[in-house]
Structures are given as C-alpha cells and as structure tokens.
Swiss-Prot record:
Protein name: Large ribosomal subunit protein uL16
Gene designation: rplP
Quaternary structure and interacting proteins, as annotated: Part of the 50S ribosomal subunit.
Signal peptide start-end: none
Record-linked InterPro entries: Ribosomal_uL16 (IPR047873), Ribosomal_uL16_bact-type (IPR000114), Ribosomal_uL16_CS (IPR020798), Ribosomal_uL16_dom (IPR016180), Ribosomal_uL16_sf (IPR036920)
Top-rank taxon: Bacteria
Organism encoding this protein: Stenotrophomonas maltophilia (strain K279a)
GO biological process, alphabetically ordered: translation
Function, in words: Binds 23S rRNA and is also seen to make contacts with the A and possibly P site tRNAs.
C-alpha cells in the first residue's frame, strides 16, 4: 500500500479540504483519465483497490499512472479510551482530493476498455468521478 517512507512530522492537523484542484487537473501522461468531481479523501486502500480493478480489467494491455499519493496521516484512539491524553496513533494514510483532480490515467487501450476499467475503479472510490480524454497531444 502507498504511504510516505518518512515524514517531517508524525501527525498533522485535521485541516480543511476546500477549493478546486489547481494542479494535476488535466490528462498529462496517458490518453484517458479518471477525474474527481467532488471533495473527499482517498485512503491508500481505496487507491490500491481501484488500481487492482483497472489492472485486472485491461489485463496486459496499456500503461497506467496513479496521479494521487496518500501523504496525510489519519489518527485514531483505541476503543474504550477516555477523551484527552493526547492525539491517537496513526491508523491509515489518505490523499485529499479536490474537484478537478486527476486520479488515474491510462493509455494503450481502446476508449471502451478505458471507460469500463474506470467505471469499475470508480465503484471502489469514495469520491464521485468522471471520464475524460486528452484534448491536445
């Protein structure tokens, strides 16, 4: 699963996830892309599950790029622990997603195959997405 090798700080503030994606909002590497249309967080498990579903559907054809990386730690306190006593331990990692963010890209397959692969992948993700094609080469 994806997670940073090392970070400057173990835990981060909750923060706010608002605004639009200013970077990574166009198909840059492949021919087709899966673009987020809503705010949300993608866990490392969700990213991996969607990657597997795309890989299984296209089999050996095509090349895929993952355009998001889970670099934010999410903490959780153990069950039946009283409030206070500091912040909990890191439970999992997430990538914060804004509308317009490209999540996956693919090339080397037909549009029908790419559409179906991304449809299967979108079912594994917690944000709404749309299928986009590259406009200019």
């Amino acid at each position: 699963m994806l997670q940073p090798k090392r970070t400057k700080y173990r835990k981060v503030h909750k923060g706010r996830n608002d605004g639009l994606s200013w970077s990574a909002n166009a198909v840059s590497f492949g021919e087709y892309g899966l673009k987020a249309t809503a705010h949300g967080q993608l866990t490392a498990r969700q990213i991996e599950a969607a990657r597997r579903s795309i890989s299984r559907y296209v089999k050996r054809g095509g090349k895929m790029w993952i355009r998001v990386f889970p670099d934010k730690p999410i903490t959780k306190k153990p069950i039946e622990v009283r409030m206070g006593s500091g912040k909990g331990n890191v439970e999992y990692w997430v990538a914060q997603i804004q509308p317009g963010r490209m999540i996956y890209e693919i090339e080397g397959v037909s549009e029908e195959v790419a559409r179906e692969a991304f449809r299967l992948a979108a079912a594994k993700l917690s944000v709404t997405t749309t299928f986009v094609t590259r406009t200019v080469r």
